[in-house]
Swiss-Prot record:
It catalyses: tRNA(Leu) + L-leucine + ATP = L-leucyl-tRNA(Leu) + AMP + diphosphate. Signal peptide: none annotated. This is Leucine--tRNA ligase. A motif ('HIGH' region) lies at residues 40-51. Belongs to the class-I aminoacyl-tRNA synthetase family. One of its GO terms (cellular component) is cytosol. A motif ('KMSKS' region) lies at residues 718-722. The keyword Cell cycle does not apply. NCBIfam families: leuS_bact. Its EC number is 6.1.1.4. The gene is leuS. It comes from Bacteroides thetaiotaomicron (strain ATCC 29148 / DSM 2079 / JCM 5827 / CCUG 10774 / NCTC 10582 / VPI-5482 / E50). Keywords: Aminoacyl-tRNA synthetase, ATP-binding, Cytoplasm, Ligase, Nucleotide-binding, Protein biosynthesis. It comes from the Bacteria.
């Protein structure tokens, strides 16, 4: 019977659906294993061959674990909200829900063709109310919680309200936006609105004034990674920094727990290091500086308290509220012009750009350690969100301060004995402190650091700051709170209405608050977000439902929030929802959560290291605090798949002609290289007729060939439509079959490395599957499988494979597994092995990689159940023992020939046989060897 992959794959994909092969339920008799891919955003372009790489890798592992007896959860869904669908809606007027559904249908069709073991009964779509019900629920929980620093967990906000009524906020140690101080009497005297403003200072989900990347053309706030060189990634529209009142999540409260949790999970060290740097823990001191000739004072944070005597200027972030307070009238015009320029740069660009810019505020600060008045400057190398948004500048010992001082001619005062700061700053934290205070100046305070090591000086200064009420010792984190508002339509609506300008949550039993219909997807004429177009977007607090906006009376009917949630909202807890996707009473049933706990294997790209992978860890820790998740860490092991790059092809057109010259002849002409569609090229040979039909301008093309062929050039580039190197997996499946695609993607190289897509090798993988098939069927359709005992050689070949593939799968070394399969099938073919006991175990071992053909052959072997329900074969070391060993025979250390010996041959017997071999006589030359060294199972060296 011929290997007809089209019929086989269609048959088994249908059978898997009918028999619910991949549906899974909790089973206490089995150990669980949860496999998860980062779910895709369904774009209009569909999948190209790079997208399934991680899905195939995780699917192989999921199938393998099932064969090992685990109860495997392997779900799939769609991250369906997002800006691309909304932009398409703006351009075409078509509702995002329509395009999103069409895109999802296309993705599902493509995914089904590849033969994944997804449990589609658990499919989720973040844009469906049944799903975002629980995103809204989690947001409400965050709004109604604060973070207790003493207990290191989220607690109900009602506890704060009760405490404020008795104690005020005396002794409170909670994460907050700013330090407040009030008594119980003062709390009780405040209006409801004033109390709500105070509570907003502590809530985990809160409204706050933040600097954002604002894109007027898109009418929305953009995340840093959505802005490139001052313009939006999508559309290339100008982006400026703007202060807006936005919903935020107090992610910073969880900074230390996010750091500590990294020690408990199996992620790569490089990715852990990326997160550690992003969280950015630093120990230091906050020190207060008074403004000269003013009652104002401000606080800076420093990790180098030892450098207080070297402060020669101060720098404020352009966004700091202090800028307006400290800018003198004489400097106002210059400062305003500078602020306008900095608005056009994102924080990420400011961090990356080392060029020096700044402006003097006109004010001075008093150094509390020297009494000196130092100028206060404004510069965009200082960021408002880190520390206090103000720094003390010590140019002798900080490279950015040094560059600034050199540029503006400010004093540079070294504080370490023997350091040379004539060309660059001395940033090392080693050496002996000097000039602290300077010997030629009368000391302003009774602190001296001279003669101490830097480490000693840091600790002594921190203690001095604490004892003299100049500030406090503090641990600081670079991690910012997450901005959680977007001025878009296609996102989760906030379950929030506004009363007297303050936000209130709609009742929990009224969730989900569904996204309303609008007829326009751009901001309103008055600048409101697109939800401002909704005609029924007011909340009736009596009837608990949405009503027409015209009914708003601000007594019982109030306006609803017009912003929507950002893209990461729906992806921050989706792994929990997969466990119990149809539960309308809870995010996940506690018993179900207790069984699945967290994701055992998570597969996705490294580009999410400081976005999704931070937010989801934070979100899960919060849910753990409120009892909605049994474990703190959502993803136990993380594997980052590499990128499959495009392999572009080129044709070479002779200048000013319609003639194209083949690759190895092009140097004889003046040519222009042009990208050509890789789908009309095979093994770098161009299909000439297909090329002529590809584009009208090539219809009359002529060719200069070599050996009767047109050979194309090639290069590795990003896979993109503009380079005509996008390969659709459907085309590969149609031509070679899904099993070939699956195995070939793994064969390209290690899962975690990036590699180019190259169809030149795919024929070899397809031939391998046909050769595997030929162990079962002859070319004349004869069924070859026999129930006969296997030979020693056949068992050795099989068990060598089982051992290799078992180890490879555990290590995600799938490329070497594919090579091992090829070697084994070649060996069995040469041995003319058609033994059932060999082929049965071979089918099971190959099944995770090529499930369709293995299901078919498993069925022909007489099994009534799926190969998925078989047991993974164990290798037997007895079969792997070598009967003979090939020894290298050397004379005076130089290899001359090889000899075979029994594996258990004694050293004396080996020596005698070597000396007796006629080939040895040439090298011994009649002499008596001084000694013979036998390295067991490797080499024999005769010393003459």
């Amino acid at each position: 019977m011929e290997y007809n992959f089209r019929e086989i794959e269609k048959k088994w994909q249908q059978r898997w659906v009918e028999e619910k092969t991949y549906q899974v339920t909790e089973d206490e008799s089995k150990q669980k294993f949860y496999v998860l891919n980062m779910f895709p955003y369904p774009s209009g372009a569909g999948l190209h061959v790079g997208h399934p790489l991680g899905y195939i890798a995780s699917d192989i592992y999921a199938r393998y674990k099932r064969l090992r007896g685990f109860n495997v959860l392997n779900p799939m869904g769609y991250d369906a909200y997002g800006l691309p669908a909304e932009q398409y809606a703006i351009q075409t007027g078509q509702h995002p829900a329509i395009t999103t559904k069409a895109n999802i249908d296309r993705y599902r069709e493509q995914l089904d063709k590849i033969g994944f073991s997804f449990d589609w009964s658990r499919e989720i779509r973040t844009c469906e109310p049944e799903y975002y019900h629980w995103t809204q629920w989690a947001f409400q929980k965050m709004f109604n919680s604060y973070y207790c620093n003493d207990e290191q967990q989220a607690r109900p906000i009602q506890e704060l309200i009760d405490a404020f009524a008795i104690y005020g906020n005396e002794g409170l140690n909670a994460a907050c936006s700013e330090e407040l101080s009030f008594t119980a009497k003062e709390w009780k005297a405040k209006s409801e609105k004033e109390q709500q403003e105070i509570l907003m200072n502590y809530r985990i989900a809160y409204l706050g004034e933040t600097m954002v990347n604002w894109c007027q053309a898109l009418g929305t706030v953009l995340a840093n990674d959505e802005v490139i060189d001052g313009v939006s990634e999508r559309g290339g529209f100008p982006v400026v920094q703007k202060k807006m009142r936005q919903w935020c999540l107090r992610v910073s409260a969880y900074a230390q727990r996010l750091l500590d949790g990294l020690d408990t999970i199996d992620w790569t060290e490089s990715l852990k290091e990326t997160q550690k740097n992003w969280i950015g823990r630093s120990e230091g001191a906050e020190v207060q500086f008074k403004v000269k000739d003013s009652d104002l004072e401000f606080t800076i944070f420093t990790t180098r308290a030892d450098t207080m005597f070297g402060v020669t200027f101060m720098v404020l972030a352009p966004e700091s509220d202090l800028v307006a307070q400290l800018t003198t009238p004489a400097q106002k015009a210059e400062v305003d012009a500078y602020l306008d320029r900095t608005k056009k740069r994102t924080e990420r660009e400011r961090i990356a750009d080392r060029s020096v810019t700044g402006v003097f505020s006109g004010s001075y600060a008093i150094n509390p350690f020297t009494g000196e008045a130092v100028p206060i400057w404004i510069s965009d190398y200082v960021l408002a969100g880190y520390g206090t948004g103000a720094i003390m500048a010590v140019p002798a010992h900080d490279s950015r301060d040094y560059a600034f001082a050199k540029h503006f001619g400010l004093e540079i005062r070294p504080l370490v004995e023997g350091c040379d700061v004539s060309e660059e700053s001395f940033d090392a934290k080693e050496g002996i402190v000097c000039n602290s205070p300077r010997p030629d100046v009368t000391p302003y305070c009774d602190l001296s650091l001279n003669g101490l090591t830097i480490k000693e000086a840091i600790e002594k200064t921190k203690q001095y700051v604490k004892e003299h009420n100049l500030g406090r010792v503090k641990v600081n984190y670079r991690l910012r709170d997450a901005i959680f508002s977007r001025q878009r339509y296609w996102g989760e609506p906030f379950p929030v209405y506004y009363k007297d300008g303050m936000p209130y949550m709609i009742d929990e039993d009224c969730l989900p608050l569904e996204l309303p219909e609008v007829d326009k997807f751009l901001p309103t004429e008055t600048g409101e977000p697109p939800l401002g177009h909704a005609k029924e977007w007011a909340w009736d607090t009596v009837n608990k439902c949405t009503v027409e906006n015209e009914k708003i009376d601000n007594v019982t009917i109030f306006p609803l929030e017009l912003n929507t949630m950002p893209g990461f909202a729906g992806s921050s807890a989706y792994y929990l929802r997969y466990m119990d996707p149809h539960n309308n009473k809870a995010l996940v049933d506690p018993k179900v959560d207790e069984y699945w706990k967290n994701v055992d294997l998570y597969v996705g790209g490294t580009e999410h290291a400081t976005g999704h992978l931070i937010y989801s860890r934070f979100w899960n820790k919060f849910l753990h605090d409120v009892g909605a998740s049994v474990v703190e860490e959502p993803f136990q092991k993380l594997v980052n798949q590499g990128m499959i790059q495009g392999r572009s092809n080129f044709v070479y057109r002779i200048k000013d002609t319609h003639t194209f010259v083949s690759l190895n002849l092009k140097d004889q002409y003046e040519v222009t290289p042009l990208h050509v569609d890789v789908n009309i090229v095979s093994n770098d040979i161009l299909d000439l007729e297909a090329f002529k039909a590809w584009r009208p301008e090539y219809a009359e093309a002529e060719f200069i060939l070599e050996d009767g062929k047109y050979i194309c050039g090639w290069a590795v580039e990003k896979m993109s439509k503009s380079m005509f190197n996008v390969v659709n997996p459907d085309m590969i499946v149609d031509k070679y079959g899904a099993d070939t695609l699956r195995m070939y993607e793994m064969f390209l190289g290690p899962v975690e490395q990036s590699k180019p897509w190259d169809t030149n090798g795919i024929d070899g993988v397809h031939r391998f599957i046909r050769k595997f098939w030929s162990l079962f069927y002859s070319r004349t359709d004869e069924y070859l499988v026999k129930d006969e005992p296997a030979t020693k050689e056949e068992l050795k070949s099989l068990h060598k494979l089982i051992k290799k593939v078992t180890g490879d799968i555990e290590q995600f070394s799938y490329n070497t597994s594919v090579s091992a399969f090829m070697i084994c099938v070649n060996e069995l073919s040469n041995l003319k092995c058609n033994k059932k006991e060999i082929l049965e175990q071979l089918v099971i071992t190959l099944a995770p990689f090529a499930p369709h053909v293995c299901e078919e052959l498993w069925d022909t072997l007489g099994h009534e159940t799926s190969v998925c329900d078989a047991a993974w074969p164990a290798y037997n070391e007895e079969y792997l023992k070598e009967d003979t060993i090939n020894y290298t025979i050397s004379f005076n250390g130089k290899a001359r020939f090889n000899m075979e010996f029994d594996a258990d041959a004694a050293s004396d017997a080996i020596q005698a046989a070597v000396l007796a071999d006629e080939r040895s006589q040439k090298w011994i030359e009649g002499k008596t060897p001084k000694k013979i060294i036998v390295v067991p199972k490797k080499i024999v060296n005769v010393v003459v």
